[in-house]
Regions:
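Non-catalytic C-terminal accessory modules of carbohydrate-active enzymes
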Residues: 10, 22, 107-262
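Catalytic cores of carbohydrate-active enzymes
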Residues: 2-139, 143
């Protein structure tokens, strides 16, 4: 329903957008009413199993309330401590990792990515599953190729916010790594981010191509600067908003060097 509402909006179908938006919200309310136990999501109505993937799907589509997020983070953390594995195959992995990054659990995602080591060691493409290489488990399969989507979007923080990347959202997840460099080729040109953490300070460089604009979303950013000076007064920075739980920065095309305290 969410995707249908977005498609209707693009097509100028206001009635369709409203209809699908209402259906999406009704479904969300029912999921929260009937498929939640102790703050996490049930696998189904008939049983009270709470596999992490059930909560991951809910997080991916924005079902939980903000008040549920601490309990959901705890749910994933406890599952990882207990098993050091999520028992999720190729198909569900994309949803699992997206939920981990959305909940700022990048360190757990980084550790779980180690299951790709045997594919890399064999110098082959992404297999259908994470089992041993065999005639039935080889070749390039989209089920396990999702790091090519997940890592640029969440570690690099780059995702489209307008048609043809006319607008870009920059929202890196800094938890779990010390540095990252990312570039994404678009019809507008190459969007680049690189960041590193040192002594409690995060340094974030951004490059946006011509005729594009960006919204940078950071954790609450103390001592925010751009190019060594005030971010609010920096050329190309249109607005800086300090909101509950995050800092938003509107920027135009160009190159930026932000720094802030974590």
């Amino acid at each position: 329903y969410q995707i249908a509402a977005e498609a209707a909006a693009v097509l100028g179908d206001d009635a369709g957008k409203e209809r699908f938006t209402k259906r999406a919200e009704a479904l969300r309310k029912n999921i929260l009413a009937y498929l939640v136990k102790d703050g996490v999501f049930l696998d189904c109505l008939e049983k009270e199993n709470t596999h992490p993937l059930a909560s991951a799907w809910a997080v991916r589509f924005g079902v939980p309330t903000a008040e549920m997020e601490p309990r959901l983070r705890e749910h994933f953390q406890n599952a990882w401590k207990r098993d050091q594995h999520f028992f999720v195959g190729g198909y569900g992995g994309c949803t699992l990792y997206e939920a981990l990054y959305r909940l700022n659990l990048g360190d757990i995602a980084r550790q779980d990515f180690q299951r790709y080591r045997h594919m890399l060691a064999a110098n082959r493409t992404n297999w259908e599953s994470f089992g041993a290489l065999s005639r039935d488990n080889m070749g390039n399969h989209a089920w396990s190729a999702y790091p090519a989507y997940i890592l640029p979007k969440f570690v690099g923080g780059i995702s489209p916010a307008g048609g043809g990347f006319s607008a870009v959202e920059i929202r890196p997840v800094f938890e779990g790594l010390q540095w990252a460099e990312t570039s994404v080729d678009t019809v507008k040109g190459t969007v680049q981010t690189d960041w590193k953490k040192k002594d409690g300070i995060c340094f974030l460089n951004i490059k946006l191509p011509a005729n594009s604009k960006g919204l940078v979303i950071l954790p609450p950013a103390k001592n925010l600067t751009e190019g060594g000076g005030s971010a609010e007064e920096a050329p190309g920075v249109h607005a800086v908003r300090r909101l509950e739980g995050r800092t938003e920065i509107e920027i135009g095309s160009g190159e930026y060097a932000f720094s802030f305290s974590l």
